[in-house]
Amino acid sequence: EAYSEYTDCSGSNLVNMITHEHDRELMKLFDLEECYDKLPPLRNAADICGHVTKEASEKTGLPEGIPVAAGMFDINACGIASGLSDEEQMCMVAGTWSINEYISKEPVTNGTVALNSLFCMPGYYLIEESSPTSAGNMEWFIRNLMSYEKAEAKENGGSVYDITNEWVASIEPQDNNIIFLPFLNGSNEDPLAKGTFVGLTAYHNKKHMLRAVYEGIVFSHVTHVNKLLRNRERPKSVRLSGGAANSDVWVQIFADALQLPIDVIEDKELGAQGAAMAAGIAAGIYKDYQDAMRRTVKITKTIQPRPEYADIYKEKYAA
């Protein structure tokens, strides 16, 4: 038997956010009304929806008969694995996409945010802002402009990321006036937006350009966070995961630009961890999401903002 799941379907505009059920009027808006009666029943993320069959066991190596939970929307999984347990907290995922989110007992209905969806914890909505403007831009820079450094690092048993962090740390923000617009993969704001370096001169080198990439990605997150803050108070801190969280110098830029403490999450694959938390609840390993977060979510460090850098980044962001 097939099932659908609340967080995923609500994030796909297939669930009425008030009734929490599939909605014929929504389907009609998408010219999919004839599909309404074919939609599978909705289940919660930690509901058991079946068990591993013999055929599936033979193909995957998983033991036959173990329970299979519904799972959840990937941004829900990242949120719960970041420890979003109440309305005060906010988290960011700096991977290919710039994902920025918090949970609320009420949806945001004024059109100022990109997405409302049902959160995996009953009684909460996930309020989210995102765009494809995060650390994927740095991967493009490394692939196209740092092939020599990447090969050299590999030959010496190191990592190209050690080099990128060293380059960025060697330049103070006030000493670099290049602005990078991180739209290599497009933008939610303007379909014609493209990635751009602004302010390049003969004085600048790859180190200056890379510093601009780090900062431009942070500024994209700042844009999304500012939109979220139209509808809530500033949090006491922000939890960060994704590739950028592996770089202390990058995390410091986040803290300085936002002027908020940044809590770095220990785990690296938060989407998988969030799904595993739902499976653990389904299997009776965890009592509920609060128990799962208490037992699995770890903060490795907190990077404090430096007030003396606030105006520098504010001026750069305004540019």
Per-region residue spans from a language model:
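Gly/Ser/Thr-rich active-site cleft segment
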Residues: 1-72, 138, 181-182, 186, ...
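Glycine-rich loop at the start of a catalytic domain that most often binds anionic cofactors/ligands
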Residues: 83-87, 104-106
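Short helix-loop-beta connector
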Residues: 62-63, 85-87, 232-236
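Hydrophobic residues within well-ordered alpha-helices
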Residues: 79-84, 275
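Short glycine-aspartate micro-motif
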Residues: 65-81, 89-93, 99-100, 180-181
